[in-house]
């Protein structure tokens, strides 16, 4: 028995597979349909255009009630969506409008923090001035912001013109990075130091001196004024990528980047290996180099590319033999990257803090230790003391006069109360840090800049009744013991076995701010901490 199959199911024609528009399913074919034996030819089908479909959808949507879109940022264009956008500002890391407020959290050295609302383009100098006013601190050019990454043990002082919001935008999300508000006495020390102390002759390439006929001092002065960029060279210990071994190489810092020679001190391009780009990176100080990175010395620094957000991979680690070499390399990196802008920041700082309020020209030269002279005011007119022995004798006489004045002050009707008040007056001073360790005092001074004359006073851990004066000189921290002594019922303090005695620590500090005494330099800057 044969079963008859309908030609509709056996045909391979496209017309049989696709029903005509408007024909319901199950409708038999028309009477004028060709037989199965005839050759069927394809016919054009009506395909609705996209515009027609959009119009039909609009008509259907207008007939339905409007439902609010719960995710408008997903439906907005990529240039306006904070999720679909490609830039950092579009991803929500920074507000798109520079005039919009931006909240930053700033920490102090004692661990306290404070949230400050500033404009998105606020610079580090503007934020510092705001924090100085709110903390009622003494305004000077030494305040600064420091970018800290505790996980990586990296620190970097922000320049005055840098935007704080842009710096925070490059941080990893959910990390422990922070901004710290503290003193930075070494920020512009490169413009105050002599050329030989900043960059020794062995660190500056001699080819530029021979080509221009300029002296070493002129080359460094042009370098500081961003007039020229000499080649900085010297030995550095660096660690290879993914390796734990440190090797000593001769490195060159140029405008094009940092290089090291694979063959001694050769400058042949065949022997130079590219390390990092200065303009696309930031240089940081490594605080725990031995513990975290296995550095052979404590004087390490790191070059971190701007595109690197987190992790140790991609960091270029270096270390020097001493603190002076590290300071020279850090200063060279800053000058190569920021150039004339760094010098402008320094000039603006001088105009802000040295010009008188009524206006006028700044002083022709800054007051330093070299411009201070000993004076004799015993007669009717002042006289400059040129003899060093006579100057030392005048300093000792001044110390004796201070002691007599203090003895007269203490000879009041209540000497016991006056003595106790004089003995505890140092606790109200910003340079007194209480009972901190020797290592902590060195860390505080190192963080605020290893400049000559930076000091603090702390309680001695070995001698319960004594104190210690920690002083920075030639980028090294030295400690001087202050011992108390009692004579005729009165308490005195001395650092030279009683040769020069003071009734309290405040008198001792004020005396050595004007006279060196047994110290290698004057007490110029006090290491202080401010709570926000």
UniProtKB/Swiss-Prot annotation:
Protein topology in the membrane: Peripheral membrane protein
SUPFAM superfamilies tied to this protein: PH domain-like, SH2 domain, Ubiquitin-like
Highest taxon listed in the record's lineage: Eukaryota
Sites annotated Important for lipid binding and for stimulation of cell migration: 239
PTM per Swiss-Prot/TrEMBL: Phosphorylated on serine and threonine residues in response to activation of receptor kinases. Phosphorylated on tyrosine residues by TEK/TIE2. Phosphorylated on tyrosine residues by PTK2/FAK1, and possibly also other kinases. Phosphorylation is enhanced by activation of receptor kinases by a cognate ligand. Tyrosine phosphorylation is essential for activation of down-stream protein kinases. Phosphorylation decreases affinity for target mRNA molecules.
Compartments reported by the entry: Cytoplasm; Cell projection; Cell junction, Focal adhesion; Cell membrane
Residue ranges occupied by any Ras-associating domain in the UniProt entry: 100-186
Protein name from the UniProt record: Growth factor receptor-bound protein 7
Organism: Bos taurus (Bovine)
Name of the gene encoding the protein in the UniProt record: GRB7
